[in-house]
Amino acid sequence: MIDKSAFVHPTAIVEEGASIGANAHIGPFCIVGPHVEIGEGTVLKSHVVVNGHTKIGRDNEIYQFASIGEVNQDLKYAGEPTRVEIGDRNRIRESVTIHRGTVQGGGLTKVGSDNLLMINAHIAHDCTVGNRCILANNATLAGHVSVDDFAIIGGMAAVHQFCIIGAHVMVGGCSGVAQDVPPYVIAQGNHATPFGVNIEGLKRRGFSREAITAIRNAYKLIYRSGKTLDEVKPEIAELAETYPEVKAFTDFFARSTRGLIR
C-alpha cells in the first residue's frame, strides 16, 4: 500500500505488497521489494534498493546506491525469510550495505535511531547497532557484531564477527578489532589495543567531571592494575554503587564472550 501523500518517482519500482508511509519520498530508479515497509517521511534519494523482509522507520534519509535487506553473505543462508529493522532519523549515505539476518543468528539485523552511516559502510547479517552511532566511510561490521549507543567506528575500520563494541567507544580509523571493546574506551590499531578513555566524547555528551574520573578509575583497574579481570570485577562493582555510569562496565562483562582488547 502506498499512502496517498507519498511521492514515488515514475522510474522507481515499488512491488505489490510493499508499504510506503505518509509523506515518504521514493526517488528515481529506486527498487522497493514486496515485503518492505517504509515509514512516514523517509526519503530514498535515488538508485536505492530495499529488499527482503525489511522495516524502515520514519524520517530516515537514504542516499544513492545504498542496498538494504539484500541476501547476506553467510554460506549457510538458504533463503529463509530473515529480516532487517531500521529505526528513525538515520542518515544512510551512498553505497551503504545492510544485509538481512540468518536463522542461526536470530534472524534479524537491527539498526536503531539517529545514526550516521557514512559512505560505503557495511553492516553484515545479525548485527545490532544502537542509537546515535557513527560508522565512518568504509567501516565494516562482520556478522553478529553489536555496537552500543554513541559508539564511533572510524573510517576503514573492521570489526571481527561476534565482537561487542561498548557504548561511547571510539574505534580509530583503519583499526582491526578482534575482541570486545569495553564502554568508554578508545581502541586503535591492528589488532586494536586500548588507548585510554574517550574523555572528549564524554564531555560532549554531558558527563560530569566526577563520573569521568570514576570511569577512568575503572579503566585503570582493568588495564593498569596488573590484576586479572575476575580480580577487579568486585572493585568495579563497588565503584558502580556510587557512580551509576560505571555500571556499564559490569553489564558489559556479563555480555562479553570474546575477551577484552588488550
Curated annotation (Swiss-Prot):
Keywords: Acyltransferase, Cytoplasm, Lipid A biosynthesis, Lipid biosynthesis, Lipid metabolism, Repeat, Transferase. It is found in: Cytoplasm. One of its GO terms (cellular component) is cytoplasm. It holds the Pfam family Hexapep. Its EC number is 2.3.1.129. CDD domains: LbH_UDP-GlcNAc_AT. GO terms for molecular function: acyl-[acyl-carrier-protein]-UDP-N-acetylglucosamine O-acyltransferase activity. It is an enzyme of class 2 (transferase). Gene3D superfamilies: Hexapeptide repeat proteins, Udp N-acetylglucosamine O-acyltransferase, C-terminal domain. One of its GO terms (biological process) is lipid A biosynthetic process. HAMAP family: LpxA (MF_00387). PANTHER family: ACYL-[ACYL-CARRIER-PROTEIN]--UDP-N-ACETYLGLUCOSAMINE O-ACYLTRANSFERASE (PTHR43480), ACYL-[ACYL-CARRIER-PROTEIN]--UDP-N-ACETYLGLUCOSAMINE O-ACYLTRANSFERASE, MITOCHONDRIAL-RELATED (PTHR43480:SF1). Homotrimer. NCBIfam families: lipid_A_lpxA, PRK05289.1. Involved in the biosynthesis of lipid A, a phosphorylated glycolipid that anchors the lipopolysaccharide to the outer membrane of the cell. This is Acyl-[acyl-carrier-protein]--UDP-N-acetylglucosamine O-acyltransferase. It comes from Escherichia coli O157:H7. The lineage of its organism: Bacteria, Pseudomonadati, Pseudomonadota, Gammaproteobacteria, Enterobacterales. The gene is lpxA.
